[in-house]
Regions:
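N-terminal lobe/hinge region of extracytoplasmic solute-binding protein
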Residues: 46-100, 233
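Active-site-proximal polar cores
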Residues: 573
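Surface-exposed intrinsically disordered loops and tails
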Residues: 160-173
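Aromatic-residue-lined binding/catalytic grooves and analogous aromatic/hydrophobic interfacial grooves
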Residues: 213-217
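Short N-terminal segments immediately surrounding and downstream of signal-peptide cleavage
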Residues: 35-48
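N-terminal secretory signal peptides
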Residues: 1-25, 31, 294
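Extracytoplasmic/periplasmic ligand-capture domains
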Residues: 3-7, 33-37, 80-81, 96, ...
Length: 612
């Protein structure tokens, strides 16, 4: 349970933790709380951004997907300890079989897997069947669900799925779930077959995503209707028992979860992985009973919650990294308290997108391209890393992220340059000049040039806002800010209502092409927030889909990066380090590389938790 306040005695007991921070400021953060049973193993956790809901077909944000990844299960998953990553069966019985041309994929579903109990099942156990996966995939194509990832699903080219969606749109009738399509079929109760219009050599990897592509029971969706985001019913290790929007999320052990044991295949030279396997091998999962998640958007209260042992785990906010993990090592005062730290370069990127449909920064004409390039050249990424991120990032050269195919650490591009003089020359050359002597540039047609930057009301965002003003003032560009909560900004971004916005993205798999989906024309309004449309880029992207990994595909990655650098629909700034701290009573933690689920793989030792 997370307390709303701390007694004087508790504050004194936690002074050892607080000593490594700046000060406690005499108060602890106000957190949500939920009733729990004594002796229950509870993982207490914090999200820095509010969730949006728990219907896999309707979400795209990271934090909602972290929750759904622990409730639903897909056909495949990732080995928790294997590095390089390895896919293994989850609800599938064995690995997928595929045709020689990679167009037909067949999967056996394990018999006897049960959904968690729910009133929708009329008090009877409900076994997962192949049809549940057929239904779940079709839901992404249903226009009524307004799925933010529908373009990505259709990109797999399931035969007949796009036509079924178009039929519903054209006739303005409910989506026809009962019509069988060739692309996604249940051959029998426990066999599902996927048939694709084009080869997809890496299709099997797409089936390893608990957060989005788990089994969904049709009767549950039909029972709850529009309230389905609050009623996730899956087969995973946990079930949702309480949800106060943007405040508290509580999961508990799923009592119908099957007998799953801790198994993994760490590399022989992976000392940490081998130690975890030796400690937990054969333990029944999940090892904990309950997960309590509070939402704390401000970094200082989030950090204090960890120091005061109100939460068990924290991704250290940037402004506290140097106190918590100087030189990448846990600070002595924290280490003395048994706190452990983990640092790793994430398979992610932070970037600013430009709305290509916006009349100020969008467009493909030379002056609009020059404006975006100039803005990118004026962005002092090294200062961002040094001052705001406290050194916890590396400069990015392209959208493709570390640890994925297509990432080349030797690749360099203008995307990684900081050159205000070149930025000013570009602006001067293309007519963005100060016509009235007020110190600010106007557009070539004489209208004011003002960048409207979408941002959030938290402390870290305010630091980025100040850097925006400083960077742009240096080249004579005025900036204003549109402030809103992160979920609101995401909704506006997908609708094409923002001029530009800075956010981040993490890879969900080892194929670097997923990062390039943010530039693929048909993904506009979905992953492609910039609404970038470029025929040659789309051709390259489509070719990458159908060929195996190898030299040809590597060359296509290079060409795609050059196109993005030339047109600058995104300014990719950094790849970030994660710095995680865990209290000594949270045991078995290891940050996943691409996947979201890990709560079932850790244990809580209540004997080491401080008494209240």
């Amino acid at each position: 349970m997370i307390d709303r306040s701390l007694t004087r005695r508790t504050l004194a007991r936690q002074a050892a933790y607080a000593a490594a921070s700046m000060t406690l400021l005499g108060a602890s953060p106000v957190l949500a709380q939920a009733p729990g049973k004594a002796g229950t193993k509870v993982l207490r956790y914090v999200f820095p951004v509010a969730e949006t809901g728990f219907d896999p077909a309707r979400i795209v944000d990271l934090y909602s997907r972290i929750v759904t990844a622990h409730i639903f299960e897909s056909l495949y998953t990732y080995d928790h300890l294997a590095r390089p990553v390895k896919i293994r069966p989850a609800l599938a019985q064995g690995m997928p079989e595929h045709s020689e041309d990679y167009r037909t994929w067949t999967v056996k579903v394990r018999p006897g897997i049960l959904f968690q109990d729910d009133p929708a099942f009329g008090g009877q156990p409900r076994e997962v069947t192949a049809q549940d996966f057929v239904y779940a995939l079709k839901r992404f194509a249903d226009p009524a669900n307004k799925s933010p990832v529908v373009a990505g699903v259709l990109e797999q080219k399931y035969i007949g799925l796009a036509a079924l969606r178009e039929k519903a749109l054209k006739e303005k009738k409910p989506f026809d779930y009962d019509t069988e399509i060739e692309g996604i079929r249940a051959l029998d109760r426990h066999t599902i077959q996927f048939r694709l219009e084009e080869p997809r050599p890496r299709f099997g990897d797409s089936l390893a995503a608990h957060d989005l592509f788990g089994a969904v029971a049709r009767e549950v969706v039909e029972k709850y209707g529009d309230a389905i985001p609050a009623h996730p019913v899956g087969t995973g290790p946990f079930r949702l028992v309480q949800w106060r929007r943007s405040s508290l999320i509580v999961l508990e052990r799923n009592p119908t979860y099957r007998d799953v044991r801790y198994e993994a295949e760490p590399a022989s030279d992976d000392a940490q992985g081998q130690a975890l396997l030796a400690r937990f091998k054969g333990r029944r999962l999940p090892m904990i009973d309950r997960v309590e998640i509070s939402i704390i958007e401000e970094t200082q209260p989030r950090w204090l919650a960890f120091l005061n042992a109100q939460i068990d785990f924290v991704n250290v906010p940037g402004e506290f990294v140097n106190q918590a993990m100087p030189n990448g090592r846990v600070a002595p005062n924290l280490a003395k308290a048994g706190i452990q730290g983990y640092r790793a370069l994430n398979p992610d990127s932070a970037f600013t997108y430009f709305n290509m449909d916006d009349p100020v920064v969008g467009g493909y004409t030379p002056e609009k391209v020059a404006l975006r390039r100039a803005i990118g050249l004026a962005m002092d990424v090294e200062r961002e890393i040094r001052v705001i991120r406290r050194g916890q990032a590396v400069p990015a050269q392209s959208m493709v992220v570390p640890h994925t195919s297509g990432y080349d650490p030797a690749f360099k591009s203008e995307n990684g340059d900081y050159d205000p003089a070149r930025a000013q020359a570009l602006l001067d050359l293309h007519g963005y000049v100060d016509r009235n002597g007020d110190g600010w540039r106007e557009r070539p047609d004489g209208k004011p040039l003002v960048l409207e930057v979408a941002t959030q009301p938290d402390q870290t965002s305010r630091q980025f806002d100040e850097l925006w003003k400083t960077n742009m003032a240096r080249v004579g560009i005025r900036v204003s800010f549109s402030i809103g909560k992160w979920p609101e900004q995401l909704k506006a971004a997908r609708a094409g209502k923002l001029m530009l916005w800075t956010l981040g993205s993490s890879a969900a798999g080892s194929d670097g092409q997923s990062s390039l989906a943010r530039l693929y024309g048909p993904q506009a309004g979905s992953q492609n927030l910039a609404r970038f449309k470029h025929p040659e880029f789309d051709r390259i992207y489509q070719r990458m889909n159908v060929i195996p990994d190898g030299p040809e595909r590597d060359e296509l990655f290079r060409q795609a990066k050059l196109i993005v650098t030339a047109f600058m629909p995104y300014k990719v700034t950094v790849h970030r380090f994660n710095n995680d701290l865990v209290h000594p009573w949270l045991v078995g933690y290891r940050r996943p590389l691409f996947w979201q689920e890990w709560w079932h793989m850790v244990d809580i030792d209540n004997t080491r938790r401080p008494a209240k």
